[in-house]
């Protein structure tokens, strides 16, 4: 049984990459609802000035729209969309699709971290996940425990960590790629459970405390 699904992306030249991302996401959710496990996407209107960006956004949207989190369900109600082919006239399509897959998989990984409850994702499990990434990717990983952070004078972080029975840690990832390239540093907040601070969260927002 074949199902034809049409997803609007806007009008012609006004279409931006995010239009394609949203349309593909909506299509993936509709296919999931229809219990489709395989799909073929035809995207003839990608051929404009931003065709490469549009194609990447389309694939990202398809991945993200098909995302489900069933870890704590005894039985998933529907099988997720697991295979899709994209028909495109963009010459560099293969490389673009690969980049989109990497980007979307990273987003889905972050979604998994957020969707897990605070008693599952702790500073220790975050550190363990970082170690796994270091084994799969060319990364140098340093994990600082309470003793090392105390020696480094990281008293603010340690003070915040005292609010939990799970001890804090700090993860540093280093990628040594092109040695001649400028040095770039990213600092990200990875609080696994944020119960307040100077702005106490009301009960309506308690479900978002694990989102940081």
Question: Whereabouts are the PLM-identified features?
Answer:
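Acidic/histidine-rich catalytic neighborhood of metal-dependent amide-processing enzymes
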Residues: 200-212
């Amino acid at each position: 049984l074949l199902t034809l699904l049409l997803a609007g992306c806007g009008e012609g030249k006004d279409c931006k990459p995010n239009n394609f991302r949203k349309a593909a996401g909506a299509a993936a959710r509709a296919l999931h609802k229809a219990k489709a496990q395989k799909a073929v996407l035809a995207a003839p209107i990608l051929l404009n000035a931003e065709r490469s960006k549009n194609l990447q956004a389309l694939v990202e949207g398809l991945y993200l729209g098909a995302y489900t989190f069933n870890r704590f369900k005894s039985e998933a109600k529907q099988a997720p969309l697991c295979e899709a082919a994209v028909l495109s006239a963009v010459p560099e399509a293969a490389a673009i699709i690969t980049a989109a897959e990497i980007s979307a998989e990273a987003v889905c990984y972050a979604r998994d971290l957020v969707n897990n409850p605070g008693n599952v994702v702790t500073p220790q499990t975050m550190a363990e996940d970082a170690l796994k990434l270091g084994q799969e990717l060319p990364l140098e990983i340093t994990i600082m425990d309470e003793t090392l952070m105390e020696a480094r004078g990281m008293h603010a972080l340690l003070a915040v960590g005292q609010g939990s029975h799970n001890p804090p840690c700090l993860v540093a990832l280093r990628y040594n790629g092109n040695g001649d390239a400028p040095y770039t540093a990213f600092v990200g907040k990875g609080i696994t459970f944020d119960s307040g601070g100077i702005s106490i969260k009301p009960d309506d927002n308690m479900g978002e405390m694990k989102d940081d």
